[in-house]
Amino acid sequence: MSKQTFTTTFAGKPLVVEVGQVAKQANGATVVRYGDSTVLTAAVMSKKMATGDFFPLQVNYEEKMYAAGKFPGGFMKREGRPSTDATLTARLIDRPIRPMFAEGFRNEVQVINTVLSYDENASAPVAAMFGSSLALSISDIPFNGPIAGVQVGYIDGEFIINPDKEQMEASLLELTVAGSKEAINMVESGAKELSEDIMLEALLKGHQAIQELIAFQEQIVAVVGKEKAEVELLQVDADLQADIVAKYNVQLQKAVQVEEKKAREAATEAVKEMVKAEYEERYVEDENLATIMRDVAEILEQMEHAEVRRLITEDKIRPDGRKIDEIRPLDAVVDFLPKVHGSGLFTRGQTQALSVLTLAPMGETQIIDGLAPEYKKRFLHHYNFPQYSVGETGRYGAAGRREIGHGALGERALEQVLPSLEEFPYAIRLVAEVLESNGSSSQASICAGTLALMAGGVPIKAPVAGIAMGLISDGTNYTVLTDIQGLEDHFGDMDFKVAGTREGITALQMDIKIAGITPQILEEALAQAKKARFEILDVIEATIAEPHPELAPTAPKIDTIKIDVDKIKVVIGKGGETIDKIIAETGVKIDIDDEGNVSIYSSDQAAIDRTKEIIAGLVREAKVGEVYHAKVIRIEKFGAFVNLFDKTDALVHISEIAWTRTANVSDVLEVGEDVDVKVIKIDEKGRVDASMKALIPRPPKPEKKEEKHD
């Protein structure tokens, strides 16, 4: 296929798609140019079904530093593992396209997005999401798209689609919403305590804007789209399924209704093992035993799936016996750990998270050097999910995509209520350790984070709580669930996480397994989540109503002084010599920003006070009319040089020593002598003249003798 180009304008920027020129061996490939951002997307499918029991979709988002005209950092000077932002963007693209593949589709699919040029005012992630959908849609891969996504901002009561960098910095909302023509199927958002009504309107505005992008994709597919390949879907043997259902459905139904998680898991596993043992013995001589046993496992999974959903939709019974809108038992504890700067333990049913706060000087902020201009990140929220939290063994190592994503969600939820840098000049790190998990652990980490911040004396604007909502839908009827547990998440259609304060929402995240959800479901889920959020905030506020008035004794104390910008170089000194000397003498940490704010950190208040004294001396300026207790440092014929303070000297001219004539300076003053002087002049070069006689009362003039006349 020869190169074909398609052009439109979207949200005030040119959107250009090129097909047929590059990556022609992929099943589908596009080059998307949005503004000056350029993204190459290639989609590839394996020829055979994978052997696993899940859909092996892999989405990558690769940031090439040349796209922003930068050299990669580090010794190797080449791109390494994906950055946190790249990982989050890959997840952002994966989530809306995953539901658009058929049930039972098991071929491996890879969608690789490579950022070739970067424009900070034209979203490369949005272009990559568009390119991913389009590459799949024009390929022979059986993808039931297209989908598209947009960013939505909110400034002065107006919604803005795909805001530029300046607009996003002023926005009260940072929302990414994706979906198909019919419905929304992915949401990721941070917000500055916005109401449910505003958030819902933002979602609908975003979905409305998506229609234009989907129509553009459909236009392109009509011209260059390939015929979809016929692929084998995972299907179980109908006779085998009927046999197992008839024999064991009742037993499995009883097992599913055991309320306690561990007991329920043991009961369902016992039924499954019994069934597997029977059919393995029956077909042990069959050459297709592996396929039969795979079908048996899939049938049992489908039976459990169907029973959980039936109980909720028809009988309104949840696996643990709760009502549809009921939250599991809650518990909140602060100051769980000694020595640390703050800690909070939050428990919701069988989900438990411990959050630990660490405060540090601003010099500890994380430097982010990606495609965007380098910046410093003051607040970090890290999420850890050890396998023991679900009673299992498993991999231990660096954080995976899921842990990075959950940490970022908590970060967005909590950063909206943090004090400004001027109010609280600390770098802040929260680490969430999930100790138990039966669903909604990311939201438990948000609640625990609130407890840790308040226990640590961080003056947050308001407590934040999070709740996960679920959905069971048969296409006609649906049930929205409050505080979903693991089984409801696994077998449900939606995981909709909502975090916020009593004033409004600070973060949203939604993933679904069906094609999309309606505005009515969104509205109901947001209303139900608000009620639940307030219940959780009641428990948090009953435990700790306000942030502790003081920091922990182990936290670094801080004092801030302001100096003139032109004095920064004086405090730092040549090659950092002066500031290093201060730090060596006092043992403190010092941060100086470009505005002249000097932050001094130490656990020793006396060291802070001494540092302030030294810096004040360094930046102090002589003023006309002020009196100083000075020391004579040099004597010349024309006067004496005195040190007023630190590195500021002044000249006391011979005529300013006394009201009477001074013949020789050395007759009156000597080096090392302390004298009081008054500054009388500072010239344009900063040279200081001082006077001793100005502090001495001027003697009266001698009276003239009267002349006698004869």
UniProtKB/Swiss-Prot annotation:
GO terms for cellular component: cytosol. InterPro entries: ExoRNase_PH_dom1, ExoRNase_PH_dom2, ExoRNase_PH_dom2_sf, KH_dom, KH_dom_type_1, KH_dom_type_1_sf, NA-bd_OB-fold, PNPase. Residues 700-710 have a biased composition (Basic and acidic residues). Residues 691-710 are annotated as: Disordered. Its EC number is 2.7.7.8. Keywords: Cytoplasm, Magnesium, Metal-binding, Nucleotidyltransferase, RNA-binding, Transferase. GO terms for molecular function: 3'-5'-RNA exonuclease activity; magnesium ion binding; polyribonucleotide nucleotidyltransferase activity; RNA binding. It catalyses: RNA(n+1) + phosphate = RNA(n) + a ribonucleoside 5'-diphosphate. Its main location: cytoplasm. The keyword Metal-binding applies. Residues 625-693 form the S1 motif domain. GO terms for biological process: mRNA catabolic process; RNA processing. It comes from the Bacteria. Residues 556-615 form the KH domain. Its cofactor is Mg(2+). It is found in: Cytoplasm. Mg(2+) binds at D489, D495. Involved in mRNA degradation. Catalyzes the phosphorolysis of single-stranded polyribonucleotides processively in the 3'- to 5'-direction. Belongs to the polyribonucleotide nucleotidyltransferase family. This is Polyribonucleotide nucleotidyltransferase.
